[in-house]
Amino acid sequence: MVYKLVLIRHGESTWNKENKFTGWTDVDLSEKGVQEAHEAGKRLLKAGFTFDIAYTSVLKRAIRTLWILLEELNLYWIPVSRQWRLNERMYGSLQGLNKSETAAKYGEDQVLIWRRSYDIPPPALEESDERYPGNDPRYAKLDKSDLPKTECLKDTVERFLPLWNDTIAPTIKSGQKVLIAAHGNSIRALVKYLDNIADDKIVSMDIPTGIPLVYELDENLKPIKHYYLADESELNAAIQAVANQGKAK
């Protein structure tokens, strides 16, 4: 039995466009991001994909990306599960700061550590900060211990895995075709887990916006292969654009 799982990072957001650390800030798609999502849906349709259920975060840039995909696929009717555990990594007090300006101030190496290291989080938010999730009604029912003030990728992996193990993996094994529309770091968390990527190797992995990533999994949900629905030159350009975000100008 071969299962297919499709992952997609949301299309470009307004803060991606402005090169800002976004994290749990609920910004929308840019005009380019909307176009990326429509193109991704068309690619999935052309490649013959269909889905029984979709998972996304509780942040509008991922939700809107999913809506557009389902529109292109004529699958508005399938169940959609919005899960806070699929949220982007919480960037703490960096949220809202321009990445290039932060790199110029603290150095590219420090920003790379904050953005891409596995176990070093950025500076944390205070609970009194309006950016703290405890001040957002969408998280009102969560235990306070689940609300991050900052996260490294290790924290994001640990936050995501219960959702994978308890909900998404059993759904895939039941034979349902699953689509996940999420964020760069929540997808990196899953990719790291699926491919068993070493902590020091995941640092250099970039997930492009708006390009479907297909995993073919065996009966134990171990990867057989994975591929993007994009040609090599387009994919490389998209990945490089993400990699350049943390560099000083």
From Swiss-Prot:
GO cellular component: cytosol; phagocytic vesicle
Entry annotation: catalytic residues: 10 (tele-phosphohistidine intermediate), 88 (proton donor/acceptor)
EC number of the protein: 5.4.2.11, 5.4.2.4
One MF term in the entry's GO annotations: phosphoglycerate mutase activity
Alphabetized UniProt keyword annotations: Glycolysis, Hydrolase, Isomerase
Pfam families membership: His_Phos_1
Reaction catalysis annotation: (2R)-2-phosphoglycerate = (2R)-3-phosphoglycerate; (2R)-3-phospho-glyceroyl phosphate = (2R)-2,3-bisphosphoglycerate + H(+)
Residues marked Transition state stabilizer (site): 183
Binding site for substrate: 9-16, 22-23, 61, 88-91, 99, 115-116, 184-185
InterPro entries: His_Pase_superF_clade-1 (IPR013078), His_PPase_superfam (IPR029033), PG/BPGM_mutase_AS (IPR001345), Phosphogly_mut1 (IPR005952)
Membrane spanning residue stretches: none
Domain of life per record: Eukaryota
Keyword Isomerase among UniProt keywords: yes
UniProt GO BP: gluconeogenesis; glycolytic process
Family: Belongs to the phosphoglycerate mutase family. BPG-dependent PGAM subfamily.
Function: Catalyzes the interconversion of 2-phosphoglycerate and 3-phosphoglycerate.
Protein name: Probable phosphoglycerate mutase
Gene coding for it: gpmA
